[in-house]
Amino acid sequence: MEQILFINACPREGSRTLELARHLLSKMEGSVEELTIFEENLLPLNGKTLALRDKMTANQNFDHPIFKYAKQFAKADTIVLAAPFWDLSFPSALKIWLEYVMAKEITFRYTKESFPCGLCKAKKLFYISTAGGPTLPSHMGFSYVDGLAKSYFGIPETVLFSAENLDVVGADTAAILSKAKEEIDNYWRDHA
């Protein structure tokens, strides 16, 4: 059975991003494991935690809780990441979580030539986002995650579903969300 990891980085009740993500998940078949980033209360990595992680990695000891998120991410068949567009990217809690996922010898390794090589099982990552205004000229939150997925994690395909301009005066929010759901439906019809 397909193992789907759903990373929920939506802190608000009634999140429109979460609404779109749930719509996508309703199309998918498999076992969904949901991780709600804001409930994890992760602290940024610091000198002490980085030294601990480096030492554990050097000793090939990956039993420590610091590797929990990397192991969870690496074993998933498909990733669904939902994050609102905040301050030109995504909520800071997601960046902190990504730092935990960036664990050498679990989600990636370096080749002899010092290039990253992905170790993740997933072949596809879906990124779901909404924005009150335009994401100008590109969605930098998605671009960042896309870069990590392809360059470090070895996930060859990333897909962005986004609804923009939801808070613009006079915007038909329901129509914008409906169009985004239709894009998900069309994608799923053509690629499932």
Regions found by a protein language model. Give the residues of each.
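N-terminal beta1-alpha1-beta2 submodule of the flavodoxin-like/Rossmannoid cofactor-binding fold
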Residues: M1-A103, E182-A192
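Conserved nucleotide-sugar donor-interacting segment of glycosyltransferase catalytic cores
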Residues: A103-E113
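Hydrophobic residues at beta-strand termini and immediately following loops
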Residues: L35, I128, F161
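A structural micro-motif
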Residues: E2, G30, K123, I155-P156
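Short, glycine-/small-residue-rich phosphate/pyrophosphate-handling segment
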Residues: T111-F153
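Glycine-rich phosphate/pyrophosphate-binding loop and the adjoining helix
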Residues: L136, Y144-A192
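Short, well-ordered alpha-helical segments in soluble proteins
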Residues: L98-V101, E105, S129, F153
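Short histidine/acidic/glycine/proline-rich micro-motifs that form metal-
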Residues: C10-G14, G132-L136, L166-V168
